[in-house]
Each structure stands twice: as C-alpha cells, then as structure tokens.
C-alpha cells in the first residue's frame, strides 16, 4: 500500500474538503491515506501553525478558505515546498462569477447563514427523530420520503442522513406476522422506498445487536426463514405498488441515501415539468 498524506485546511468545518478527498480516494485501492484536519483557520496566526505541520508532514493540501490573503499565504508556502495545493471550490466560484457576470464579493463574513436551507434541515432532522420506527403515522403526509423494511436494514441512519440533506424522512419497520399500517392501502404522494438485505447478512447484524444488549431469548429475531419472509414480503408490498426497492446488503448508508435522493429528485423533476 502506498501511503499518502493529505492536509485538509478550512475556515469552516473541513467537511467539503473531506468529502472531496474521500471521493477521490475511492478511485484508488492501493493508497493508504492519512488525513490531517485543520478546521476554523481564520487568521494568519492559526494558518502559520498549520504551515509548520505541513512542512513537517509533506503531503497534498486541499483547502476551502475564503480570505484572499490567507489563500495567497497558503498557496505560496506550498509552491515553495513543491507540494500540491488545491482549492476545492475556487474553480467553481470563478466560473460562477464569469458565467453570471457578477464579481466575487470581497467582504468575508464568517457568521453562519441562518437561511431557509438551514431551518429546513433542522426541521427535517426533528421530523426524522419524531417519526422513527413507525411513530406518529398520522403525520406521514408531511414526509418527503417514507422508508419501509425489516428491522436493522439501516432505516434510521438513512433517514437521518436524508434529513441532513433537507429531506423529511419517516421510517416504518416490517415485522413478520404483525399487521402493517394501513397507509399502504391509500394513494399517497410521498416517495416510498423499500429497504431489503441478504438474510445471512441481516442475521449477523441482528445477532451483534442482541449480544450488545445481552439478550439471548429472542430466537425469532435471528431466524433465517422469518428474516427471508420479511424481506420477501417487503419486496412484494413494494412491487404491487410500483415502489422502488433497494438492497442494502453491500451499500453504505451514504450510498443508500444517495440512491434514494436520486430517485426522489428524478421523480420531483418529472412532476415539475
């Protein structure tokens, strides 16, 4: 494995640089990365501390810094060390300015923008928490997305991830031999997505959960036949109603959420034509 040092430098949380780095690293199977996070770098004193670390640990520098003087100092320093220094959004900002014929604003304001997007995200997170695991079904019409699936198919973390992207997601568990909420018999506008998983994989996850909780008596929870029937029934429910189904057996939460968002926005764009 080839070791690669990456410095993530930001005047905010470094999440943008981190996502960009991880997306790029996903293209390489033979690289073992070491990421150094340098958030909230907003003055020269803090930047100089980072520069000394970069000097002692040479590697690629990815940055998102708004202040022009700080950017110049960082890029000049890296140029002299002959190491790559890449602005994650610099090219995007420049192209936006050129295309819109609007100059980039010189004044920097580090106060977070409490705009509509921010409050929509807070509301979506609150909604996901209150409508987890089949709670408050009477408020399902407020959801953007409804997830259904057997227990431990990542419905809750996927709902929260969707919420961080501003989408209100409710989730409802399917339990073998238990009546499913009657909302499935109604015509609903929300996107409903079924989550299923390989039964053997789900057994592993559920057994780990029971061991963590020190529970040894719930045999039906890890019974292969019951788990298989739960997944088959979820598929059947979704197929009868033309609802999409996603197999999460080998998918990360981020990947599952991304697929759901693609379906959601494709559907939304279709209706908005």
UniProtKB/Swiss-Prot annotation:
Belongs to the pyruvate, phosphate/water dikinase regulatory protein family. PDRP subfamily. It comes from the Bacteria. The lineage of its organism: Bacteria, Pseudomonadati, Pseudomonadota, Alphaproteobacteria, Rickettsiales. GO terms for molecular function: ADP binding; ATP binding; phosphotransferase activity, phosphate group as acceptor; protein serine/threonine kinase activity. Keywords: Kinase, Nucleotide-binding, Serine/threonine-protein kinase, Transferase. This is Putative pyruvate, phosphate dikinase regulatory protein. PANTHER family: PYRUVATE, PHOSPHATE DIKINASE REGULATORY PROTEIN 1, CHLOROPLASTIC (PTHR31756:SF3). The keyword Transcription does not apply. Gene3D superfamilies: P-loop containing nucleotide triphosphate hydrolases (3.40.50.300). HAMAP family: PDRP. Bifunctional serine/threonine kinase and phosphorylase involved in the regulation of the pyruvate, phosphate dikinase (PPDK) by catalyzing its phosphorylation/dephosphorylation. It catalyses: N(tele)-phospho-L-histidyl/L-threonyl-[pyruvate, phosphate dikinase] + ADP = N(tele)-phospho-L-histidyl/O-phospho-L-threonyl-[pyruvate, phosphate dikinase] + AMP + H(+); N(tele)-phospho-L-histidyl/O-phospho-L-threonyl-[pyruvate, phosphate dikinase] + phosphate + H(+) = N(tele)-phospho-L-histidyl/L-threonyl-[pyruvate, phosphate dikinase] + diphosphate. The keyword Transport does not apply. Transmembrane segments: none annotated. ADP binds at residues 149-156. Its EC number is 2.7.11.32, 2.7.4.27.
